C-alpha cells in the first residue's frame, strides 16, 4: 500500500503545478454539460432560479459547508484549488465513486478569494488551501481540462475553445483586504473584534453599530457581497468592450493601410 501511494505522488510530481494565474477544480460533470450550464455555477444559483431562494454570499458559511460535509443548497461560491495536485487529491476523495471525472483549469479573476487569507485562524479547513469564486466561473474563464479515469490523470490538457484570454489575462484574485468585510462570521463572533476584521466589520457585526434597525450583520454582509459581485461583473464587461474596441481599431487601421 505504501508503495502504491509513493508511486501515485511520483506520478503527480511529473506535472507542472507552478502557475500563479491558474486555479483548478475537480468536477464529475463533463465539459459539454459545463458548457451548457454556462460554466461552473454555484449551487445557490440553481436554487435561486428553481425555488427563489436567495444565494448565501457568506464565505464563512461556504467554507464550513453543512454538518454532513456537503455543499450548502444556497451556496453562492464555487470552490477551486491552488494546484493540480490538490485538485486531484480532492477528486480522489469526493469523486471516488466516479470512474471518470475532470479537473478544470481556470483563469484567476477578482471575484475569487483565498479562504485562508480572508478567514485567517478561523478558516475551518486550512489544509484544503481553497480559493472560492463568488458567483461562479463562466465557461469563457475555463482554460481547459484534464480527464481523470479510474484515478489516473491524463497527461494531455484539453484546451477550451471557448476560453477568452482577453477577458482574464490581466486579472488576479482579490486581495485579502477586499474579502474581510465579506468573511461572514456570526454577529457575535470574536473575529469581528480582532485584527484585521475589526476594521472591516459591516454594521451590526461585532462592535460595529447597526446602520438601521432593519439591517442585521448577515443582511449587511449579503448586500456588500451583491455590490462586490456587481462591480466585478461591470469590470469584466468593460474589459470585454475594450477588447472588442481594440479589434475594431486594428481592423480599421489595416483597412486604411491597404
From Swiss-Prot:
Keyword Glycosyltransferase attached: yes
Signal peptide (residue range): 1-18
Sorted UniProt keywords: Disulfide bond, Enterotoxin, Glycosyltransferase, NAD, Nucleotidyltransferase, Signal, Toxin, Transferase, Virulence
Any GO MF annotation of the entry: nucleotidyltransferase activity
Binding-site list for NAD(+): 25-28, 41-43
Pfam families per UniProt: Enterotoxin_a (PF01375)
Active-site residues (renumbered): 130
UniProt entry tagged with the keyword Nucleotidyltransferase: yes
Top EC class, one word: transferase
Subunit structure and binding partners: The holotoxin (choleragen) consists of a pentameric ring of B subunits whose central pore is occupied by the A subunit. The A subunit contains two chains, A1 and A2, linked by a disulfide bridge. Interaction with the host protein ARF6 causes a conformation change so that the enterotoxin subunit A1 can bind NAD and catalyze the ADP-ribosylation of the host Gs alpha.
Other known facts: After binding to gangliosides GM1 in lipid rafts, through the subunit B pentamer, the holotoxin and the gangliosides are internalized. The holotoxin remains bound to GM1 until arrival in the ER. The A subunit has previously been cleaved in the intestinal lumen but the A1 and A2 chains have remained associated. In the ER, the A subunit disulfide bridge is reduced, the A1 chain is unfolded by the PDI and disassembled from the rest of the toxin. Then, the membrane-associated ER oxidase ERO1 oxidizes PDI, which releases the unfolded A1 chain.
UniProt comment concerning the protein's domains: The four C-terminal residues of the A2 chain occupy the central pore of the holotoxin. Deletion of these residues weakens the interaction between the A subunit and the B pentamer without impairing the pentamer formation.
Summary of the function given for this chain in its UniProt record: The A1 chain catalyzes the ADP-ribosylation of Gs alpha, a GTP-binding regulatory protein, to activate the adenylate cyclase. This leads to an overproduction of cAMP and eventually to a hypersecretion of chloride and bicarbonate followed by water, resulting in the characteristic cholera stool. The A2 chain tethers A1 to the pentameric ring.
Family per similarity comment: Belongs to the enterotoxin A family.
Listed name of the protein: Cholera enterotoxin subunit A
Organism of origin: Vibrio cholerae serotype O1 (strain ATCC 39315 / El Tor Inaba N16961)
Gene: ctxA
